[in-house]
Design a protein with these regions (language model features):
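Conserved anion-binding
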Residues: 1-61
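Glycine-rich phosphate-binding active-site loops on the catalytic face of alpha/beta enzymes
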Residues: 1-9, 53-69, 91-93, 102-124
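Catalytic cores of alpha/beta
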Residues: 38-49, 75-86, 92-108
Length: 124
């Protein structure tokens, strides 16, 4: 598992080597990034390094920070091809948010509000 402390301390090479080690394990790898805990430069660098090393599955947010804004989603989609798996987590509370995320090109959402969202679907 890459240590984001290395990234935050600008130990970019170490961060990249840690991703390579995990990638070589031949198990499916999803890189989980909480963009609210990284400045924009490091956030972009983490994505660039991950893409260069062949990471194809990303999760943005961990449910413990602020929700990811639509502006953030747009920026993420510009950096990462829609061919990659992109999951957004945190702050997703209703069906319209889920639909908007899927319409924008997000692959998957994570929410603890599944029951409420499913109830909205049932009432349609």
């Amino acid at each position: 598992m890459p240590n984001f402390i290395n990234l935050s301390k600008r130990n970019i090479d170490t961060f990249g080597m840690e991703i390579e080690i995990v990638k070589r394990s031949a198990i499916p790898v999803t890189l989980i990034i909480n963009n609210s805990k990284l400045d924009k430069e490091l956030f972009v660098k983490a994505i660039e390094i991950s893409l260069e090393l062949g990471i194809k599955s990303f999760q943005f947010g961990d449910g413990f920070g602020p929700p990811i804004s639509t502006l953030d989603v747009d920026e993420i989609l510009k950096m990462i091809s829609k061919k990659n798996h992109i999951k957004i987590v945190g702050g997703i509370k209703n069906l319209s948010q889920v639909i908007d995320l899927f319409d924008s090109g997000i692959s998957c959402v994570g929410t603890s509000n599944f029951s409420e969202i499913f109830e909205e679907v049932r009432n349609i």
